[in-house]
Amino acid sequence: EPVTVPEPECYTSYSHPLPTADGRIIALKEDFDRPSAFVLIDTVERSERRITYTGDVSTRPALSPSGRLWWTEYRRSPLYAEKVASQLCYMDIESGKPKIIRKQRNALYPTPIREHGIAWVEYTYDGSYSVVVNGPLDLDRHNTIPYGKEVHGMAWDNLTDRLYLLITDDDGMHIARLTKEGLKRVTEPAYLTLSDLTARDGKLYYGSIASGRDELHSFDLATGREYQLSTSRFGSFDPSAVNDTLLLATTYDQRGYMPATQRIAFERVVEPTKIPQKMLLPKVKDWD
């Protein structure tokens, strides 16, 4: 179901909608007339307020329970225009101004964890990745990801108190759990695109093309089952759980990419597969 927003004056894209504690929605908004900005959507008043303009946002934003918004932006070096780094940014949505943690370069996927902690992914230009954890029990703890594995998303689940990552390697793409011993596979590798990983109450939410188009999926960590949650005409993206029964997401219509809500119903089980369905591909004859 579409979220009510002010009628766009031109082609507009909303992305990464996030629920706040008071029932409002934070989303990243872009159009052809203005720079990208985070906006606060009030669905009751049917109003929208800009929080702050942004630069080139490099990975999905995340909101902590205390109301602090985290994201990363690509920033050029003041000395060398061809040198670009992804820097960690944050702001308190009600009272603060956006700030940059300048010492943390090459940061991706900022993820709030327990007790006001924060974790993120760091990368080097040779293709190495590590997960940095800062919390009451850990201070600047680096977890090195084995070489040859790329990180494409990260989320923290409050029920299991673990970080989960989207990993790509020679075997395909899969979800892994970060443990003290290293990475442990949660799903089997497959040649499927997974995206925008989030987590809540023992369940992972993400986008998947297993059905042949981008749809919202969930993985139950207790049962090990995967479910398809949406069936949309042009695809759905950026899931973020409001509670046990409702998701925020992005979907597409004639106005552009718009925020929407999706009911959570664990009815359509997704069987493991190595490749997506050939829904959008033309029919071809098998070779002899």
Cite the ranges covered by each PLM segment.
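C-terminal, active-site-flanking charged/polar segments
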Residues: 224-280
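A short beta-strand motif characteristic of beta-propeller blades
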Residues: 2-8, 47-52, 96-102, 139-145, ...
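Short loop/turn segments that connect beta-strands within beta-propeller blades
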Residues: 42-46, 92-96, 134-138, 178-182, ...
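A flexible loop/linker signature enriched in serine peptidases of the S9 family
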Residues: 9-12, 29-39, 52-59, 72-89, ...
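Outer-membrane beta-barrel initiation region
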Residues: 1-20, 29-30, 208, 257-258, ...
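Short coil/turn segments that connect the beta-strands within blades of beta-propeller domains
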Residues: 22-24, 66-67, 115-116, 159-161, ...
